[in-house]
Amino acid sequence: MRENVVVSNMERESGKPVAVVAVVTEPWFTQRYREYLQRQKLFDTQHRVEKMPDGSVALPVLGETLPEQHLQELRNRVAPGSPCMLTQLPDPVPSKRAQGCSPAQKLCLEVSRWVEGRGVKWSAELEADLPRSWQRHGNLLLLSEDCFQAKQWKNLGPELWETVALALGVQRLAKRGRVSPDGTRTPAVTLLLGDHGWVEHVDNGIRYKFDVTQCMFSFGNITEKLRVASLSCAGEVLVDLYAGIGYFTLPFLVHAGAAFVHACEWNPHAVVALRNNLEINGVADRCQIHFGDNRKLKLSNIADRVILGLIPSSEEGWPIACQVLRQDAGGILHIHQNVESFPGKNLQALGVSKVEKEHWLYPQQITTNQWKNGATRDSRGKMLSPATKPEWQRWAESAETRIATLLQQVHGKPWKTQILHIQPVKSYAPHVDHIVLDLECCPCPSVG
C-alpha cells in the first residue's frame, strides 16, 4: 500500500472510472474512521466502503490524496494503534446514493469531490454555478452561458473539464455564449474539451452535421420542422431566405417532396454544413445554394413558397420574398417572428404606429381578408384557433397588409393576401413567443 496516491491524467482520459483514494484499516475500526472522515467532510459518499482481499476495509475519501496530518490523527487519536494506510480503488463501486441521483446531482458530487481535492473549499456559490441543463450532441455536451462563471473555476485548469465530462458521460465539452449580432447568427461557443466541435444530430430521420462553435441548432424548432415536413409540396419550387445548415430546407426536400429549393445563406461555416447535409441526405441535386446577402438575390418570379426563418424578425427579407414569388399564381410565405404579448400591449407598442395602422388597413388598391369585427378566417372561411393570442393576431394582420403593399410595389399591380395559419413554435420568455405566419399571396385578376 502506498502513502501518497495521486490519480493520473491517463486514468481520467481512458474513459474508465476514475480511481478513488481510500483509507485502509481493520474492520473493527471502520465506524470510528467513518465518523472522523464525515466530521472532517472528507468521506466520499459517492462510493461504497469496500472489503479488501486480505480482510481489511477501504473507506473512500475525497480528493487525490489525504494529508499526513489526518492519517496521524486516525492512527493516534481516533483509533490508537490502528493500521492506517492509503490505497487506490481502481474500479470503485458507486454507492446506492450515487446510483440513484440525477445527472445534475452526479455532476455536483463529482465536481465537489474533485475541487476539494485541489484544496479549494466547496461552497454554495460554486454549487449554484453548476449547470442544471445542457444540450447533448452525441459525445459532446453544450453547456449554457450562465454556468461556471465564478472566478474560482479559472484557476482549476483543464482537469476541471475532464471531471465534468466524465461525470456526464461525454468526451467533449463546449460552452455557449451569446449569438453574434453581425447577422450571420454565429454562436459564441468555446470548446472546453476536445479537438473539434463537429457533431451530428438526427431530427425526424434527417441528418444534420455541423460545428457547434460556428453554427446554431435549435431543438425548440422541432415542432415547426415536423409541421413543414407534413406539408404536400410536390412539384413546388421554394426559396429559403435564411437556410442556415438546412433547418427547414431539408424537411421540405426530404419529407414534403419539394421539387427544388433555392437556399440562401451568408454564414460561410453554415454553407459548408448545408452543402454536406444536402449530400448525406441524398437531396443535393434538388437544391442550389446562394451564398451571400439575400437582399442582393437575382432570382424573381420563381417561388411557390418562401421560408423566412429568421428571428426576432425577418422583415428585412420581406421585399425579396415578394420579388421571388411567382407573378402568375403567387404563393405562400412562411414568416417567422418573435411577438411580445405583455398584458395591455397594443399594436403601437409592438412597433406599429397609429398612422401606419390606419394607412395599412385602408389603402384603396389592396385586398386583404380582415373582417369588420377584427377576427381573421383561414382559407376555408373558418375562424382561427381561439388559442391564438390577440397580439399574434394583430401582428399577423399588420404583416398581412404590409406585404400586400410590398407586393403591389414590386409587381406593379394589386395582390390579395390572406392569413392561412398562425403557428406557435416556442416561448423565449413569459411574454415573448416565436410564431410562424403562413400567408397566402395571390395577384388580383385583371379587370376588363
From Swiss-Prot:
**InterPro entries, sorted:** MeTrfase_TRM5/TYW2, SAM-dependent_MTases_sf, TRM5-TYW2-like_MTfase, TRM5/TYW2-like_N, TYW2_N
Name the reported effect of residue 265 to A.
Lack of activity
The EC code for this enzyme is 2.5.1.114
Q: Which reaction does it catalyse?
A: 4-demethylwyosine(37) in tRNA(Phe) + S-adenosyl-L-methionine = 4-demethyl-7-[(3S)-3-amino-3-carboxypropyl]wyosine(37) in tRNA(Phe) + S-methyl-5'-thioadenosine + H(+)
Write out the entry's keywords from A to Z. S-adenosyl-L-methionine, Transferase, tRNA processing
Q: EC class of this enzyme?
A: transferase
Protein's job: S-adenosyl-L-methionine-dependent transferase that acts as a component of the wybutosine biosynthesis pathway. Wybutosine is a hyper modified guanosine with a tricyclic base found at the 3'-position adjacent to the anticodon of eukaryotic phenylalanine tRNA.
**Name under which the protein is recorded:** tRNA wybutosine-synthesizing protein 2 homolog
